[in-house]
Amino acid sequence: MFKEKKAPLVCKFGGTSVGTSSSIQRVCEIIRKEKPSFVVVSAVAGVTDLLEEFCRAPVGQKSQFTAMIREKHESIAKELGIDVAIEPFLGPLKQFEGAGHLQQEDQAKILAIGEDLSASLICSYCRANSLQLEQLEARQVILTDSQFLRAEPDLALMQTMWGELVLKENTIYLMQGFLGATASGATTVLGRGGSDFSASLVGELCEARELRIYTDVRGVHTADPKILKDTQLIDFLTFEEMQELASSGSKVLHQDMLKPCIRAKVPIFVTSTFDLTKEGTWICASLNEGVEGPEIKALSLKANQALWFVEYHSPLMRLENVLRCVRGLGSIPGVVMAQNSGVYFTVDWEENNQSMTEALREFGAVSCEGPVSLVALVGAKLTSWSMTGVFDALQGTPVLYWSQTDTVINLIINEESGVVVTKLLHDYVLGLNRSGL
């Protein structure tokens, strides 16, 4: 492993940033100008969805998804004027076109194809335009356990292997996001949105000076600009604030990707691939000296949630055991609200939740309500925030449950009220900010 005189810059480009030939050209321009040490890329926009459809499709219908994936990449390559061998990457698809049920290990091989293809396209185009990149194979860097579809990185093993890599100075390395491998070499994936996680792990390994996330928005906004029109760009967020937003519905960053950056103290800058203003949001351990944000900085909305409550049958029950049980069933707890008598938590709603109910009965009486929406107000020093104004802003909209910590106020409401409540609270927060309260 080399040590640069200047700490490395890691750049990550999401699916929308590599979704068309013109966007790939833009990515090449950014790489040429910024000269990052490491570039991590997602699959072409929409391709992971097609690969998931392939895995679910019955025998006889899988081949249509193979054809769509082939056509999408061949079309981009043609528009870019490059010659890329697409067919070798499609081998696992052809292999399983006649298969019914796919094992998780086989699904991981299939889902990884998207990033393998996009990395090949981008590397070929950059080289064709006199920008020399070296490909860094993710399966040799992101080493994981054998939970094939939501693998956990083995950080100790990764650090050992990273130290043994022979990397050249003054070289740009391009790596696939989202995927990794077990110690024995079997392909694994990190779960949807896992390319962010891959990039943050690389940032931790190389002790990066900055992790720059390029996406289709300029940064983190006061609410999702795809839901509300009058959102504002946030200049700075702490890691803790971004963690709350990510766990409660914000789609800007993957929930797990913050942990490596927190451990290694790597600041994150979120910006747009397509906006030439270079505006964005800094996410770091603490706000820059002299910068004071509003008490409530942002809102997030997470729809189609289930609100579970486990009322402990013994005071010896432990929260971590409940959450371990939930994760063992393949669900990811979003908001967790602990009480002395039990715990409330949210996960994605499923009509058939019998297996979750039966598993949780080990800890106490179980109830579930859903589907519901979760609206979170994220900021700083919120334990002292008066809830009167929040409830007044809701204009009588029923709240099923709410909780308040130093960094987040969580509201559980009826599913159909999610967007309306987000708009009402966003107007309330912006009004306070404008008045300086």
UniProtKB/Swiss-Prot annotation:
It comes from the Bacteria. It comes from Chlamydia muridarum (strain MoPn / Nigg). One of its GO terms (biological process) is lysine biosynthetic process via diaminopimelate. Belongs to the aspartokinase family. GO terms for molecular function: aspartate kinase activity; ATP binding. The lineage of its organism: Bacteria, Pseudomonadati, Chlamydiota, Chlamydiia, Chlamydiales. The keyword ATP-binding applies. Pfam families: AA_kinase (PF00696). Keywords: Amino-acid biosynthesis, ATP-binding, Diaminopimelate biosynthesis, Kinase, Lysine biosynthesis, Nucleotide-binding, Transferase. PROSITE patterns: ASPARTOKINASE (PS00324). The keyword Transferase applies. Transmembrane segments: none annotated. Pathway: Amino-acid biosynthesis; L-lysine biosynthesis via DAP pathway; (S)-tetrahydrodipicolinate from L-aspartate: step 1/4; Amino-acid biosynthesis; L-methionine biosynthesis via de novo pathway; L-homoserine from L-aspartate: step 1/3; Amino-acid biosynthesis; L-threonine biosynthesis; L-threonine from L-aspartate: step 1/5. InterPro entries: AceGlu_kinase-like_sf, Asp/Glu/Uridylate_kinase, Asp_kinase, AsparK_Bifunc_asparK/hSer_DH, Aspartate_kinase_CS. Its EC number is 2.7.2.4. PANTHER family: ASPARTATE KINASE, ASPARTOKINASE. It catalyses: L-aspartate + ATP = 4-phospho-L-aspartate + ADP. This is Aspartokinase. One of its GO terms (cellular component) is cytosol.
